[in-house]
Amino acid sequence: MYRRILLAATAAALLAGLAPARAQAPAPVELAGVKYPHTVQVAGSNLQLNGAGIRYKFIIKVYTAGLYLANKATTPEAVLAAPGNKRMHVVMLREIDGNELGKLFTRGMQDNAPKDEFSKFIPGMLQMADVFSTRRKLSAGESFSVDFVPGTGTQVLVNGKATGEVIREPEFFNALMRIWLGPSPADRLLKDALLGQSANSLSRNQ
């Protein structure tokens, strides 16, 4: 009896050892100590990390940024045309004045928006500038996200909390994304990283 039990236990152990290990979730992408999970949920939809990188000003690390989409996209055009929910998540690596950040967004949108479309983004730009101008500063480690949900609009979250009104203009999110992905991006290597083309920016991002 004991021999049968022992043989059965041994066989079970061998079979368990041969069974494929459970698939483990991939480790988050880590940049300057900031971790970006490979998947997040936005308004009930699972999104995957399209790419992440660091925004530099000269040699100073300013913030990390990660772009989440329903499906991978490797060109600015594909990102802007992608259906479904989207998220841009930014974590500060140094302190920045809230009013200055709002002005930088406005300037970046102005530099990259089609000239004949820029005027219709002004109300949304003012809304977003207000979100940051009401904060004295964003410190290192603080974060903000910009979520887009079709049919609803663009919502800014600061440190994970929805801030300000939803920006209803459907094209506003794309106008905002052009700050990082447009013809005059905030940082060209960050643009490549957000598009998943990080090979040319890995050494700089470490």
Task: Annotate each predicted stretch with a short phrase.
Residues 24-82:
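N-terminal secretory signal peptides
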Residues 188-206:
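Cysteine/selenocysteine-centered motifs that mediate thiol-based redox chemistry or coordinate metal-sulfur cofactors
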